[in-house]
């Protein structure tokens, strides 16, 4: 429900680029997935972005849910949304794409990869996509989801008109509950999980079995 509000937080922070060096320019892009029955207030988003002096671009796309029944709707939507973002970025000469993922997103992805993929990895704060000559950055990677929710409430950001019907049916929503359970066991669990990503003790891990 707060995806749009994350975008607005990024735009608000981007406004501060006027006092930073090196100089850079930003544009806001909203990808509309026409085959998923959710609804955003596009006029509100456009007015908010342009009120900060940020150009707003709306790009529609869709995908066929039947193309790969092994993949969840959330995975297919995310993959096609990302592809559309690359298309728009290339068309407008952008070299970086700033995504609104926060710390909770990154830790939930880590837990999903461990649980379902048997891999220790997640979404990095910075990812150079050499194939596309593009860099993905996640400027809110250290921000808690609860802090963004508080900011959205204080600033009076509007929520989506209609949320995605698949929102509560994904592995991510399950991992969100797992993270909450871990924090009940240890209030500092999120920081331990984060620290584990840069504290790999290879000598204490089993060798790969072919």
Residue spans for each PLM region:
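Single conserved hydrophobic/aromatic residue that forms the stacking wall/gate
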Residues: 1-6, 10
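Short, surface-exposed alpha-helical segments at coil->helix boundaries
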Residues: 11, 39-46, 145, 149
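A structural signal for isolated positions on well-ordered beta-strands in alpha/beta enzyme cores
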Residues: 25-29, 57, 135
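Short histidine/acidic/glycine/proline-rich micro-motifs that form metal-
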Residues: 30-37, 165-169
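A conserved beta-strand->alpha-helix junction
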Residues: 43-68
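Active-site adenylate/phosphate-handling loop in enzymes that bind or generate adenylated species
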Residues: 75-147, 193
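ATP/NTP-dependent adenylation/nucleotidyl-transfer catalytic domains that generate, transfer
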Residues: 121-124, 128-210
């Amino acid at each position: 429900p707060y995806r749009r509000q994350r975008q607005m937080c990024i735009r608000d922070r981007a406004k501060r680029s006027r006092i930073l060096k090196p100089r850079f320019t930003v544009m806001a892009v909203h990808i509309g997935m026409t085959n998923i029955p959710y609804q955003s207030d596009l006029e509100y988003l456009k007015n908010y972005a342009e009120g900060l002096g940020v150009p707003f671009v709306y790009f529609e796309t869709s995908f066929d849910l039947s193309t790969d029944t092994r993949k969840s709707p959330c995975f297919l939507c995310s993959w096609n949304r990302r592809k559309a973002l690359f298309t728009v970025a290339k068309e407008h000469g952008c070299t970086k794409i700033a995504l609104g993922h926060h710390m909770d997103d990154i830790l939930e992805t880590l837990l999903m990869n461990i649980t379902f993929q048997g891999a220790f990895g997640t979404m990095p704060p910075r990812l150079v996509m050499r194939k596309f000559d593009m860099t993905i950055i996640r400027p809110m990677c250290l921000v808690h989801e609860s802090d963004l929710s508080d900011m959205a409430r204080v600033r009076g950001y509007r929520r989506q008109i209609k949320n995605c019907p698949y929102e509560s049916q994904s592995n991510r929503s399950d991992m969100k509950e797992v993270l909450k359970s871990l924090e009940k066991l240890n209030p500092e669990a999120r920081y331990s999980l984060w620290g584990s990503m840069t504290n790999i003790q290879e000598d204490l891990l089993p060798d790969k079995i072919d």
